[in-house]
Amino acid sequence: IFAIILFEMLGFLDDYKKIKEHNKDGLKGKYKIVGQVTVGLIVGLTMYLSPDIVVRENFEMPSKTDDQIEVKYKPMEEKQPITTIPFVKSNNLNYSWFTQWMGDHAETGGWILFIIITIFVVAAVSNGANLTDGLDGLATGTSAIIGVALAIMCYLGGNIIYSSYRNIMYIPGSGELVVYAASFIGALIGFLWYNAYPAQVFMGDTGSLTIGGIIAVFAILIRKELLIPILCGIFLIENLSVIIQTSYFKYTKKKYGEGRRIFKMTPLHHHFQKQGNAGIVAKWQKPINPIPESKIVVRFWIIGIFLAIITFITLKIR
């Protein structure tokens, strides 16, 4: 709730400056980043300091009987910087593995690494949602799809029987978040009713930054933050398109004296709206004919659904 309020305030200030000062840029980027980093830091520290946020692990208990060693597993709730990672055995990764060189302080180092990744995920996802909110219904529909996937993972991870059967990390009490996830999905679908093309209402940065923040924090709470690049692939590609375009433009301007583009326009969804070979100098001109806004949105939704399915599949591939 605290994260939601902070993101709403951040987005509101951005929208307020755009309307009040007639400034399309709104709040300066550095102030947005400061706000996003602050929220990420608070979430990371809360995960570290709260004694109620734990995960359940199976610990080996070997016993020797009649020259045979029998290994039993006892489930114990532990406070560890553990997360879910695809393509590996048991799907679990302890951040302390990267800080073993710190010796007795490896666990503390693991938590520091976890907090750093939390900050990055919160900033990246909230910014990605903000960039995706450029066409009617695009960010809303995409976020609803992501919300459904997170709700399912949350439900499975909060049930000890289902989590054991599906080999998903069991997090005591996380099942309670399903109610919040359902509210989030319901709000998005209700908003989409009026936000679909042609839109009657718009969320602005107040909504898009908050939606991205909710998705990021939710994924972190259920230890699925490393699945974000797959699940939130639409947000990722929108972010990358802007970064690539800006970096390439600055590089070519410095080298050749004039800035050059890779895409006709960024974020990426705007690239498909523009006519190819029609005066816009860019390396990637396809598609030549502009695609209607409604078709771009639906195609991005379809990609989002496939990404959600792939996210679940990765948990079974080891």
Residue ranges and their predicted role:
Residues I1-M9, Q36, L41-P75, K79-P81, ...:
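Alpha-helical transmembrane segments
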Residues K18-K28:
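Membrane interface segments of multi-pass transport proteins and intramembrane proteases
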Residues V88-F120, S126, V297-F300:
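Individual transmembrane alpha-helix segments
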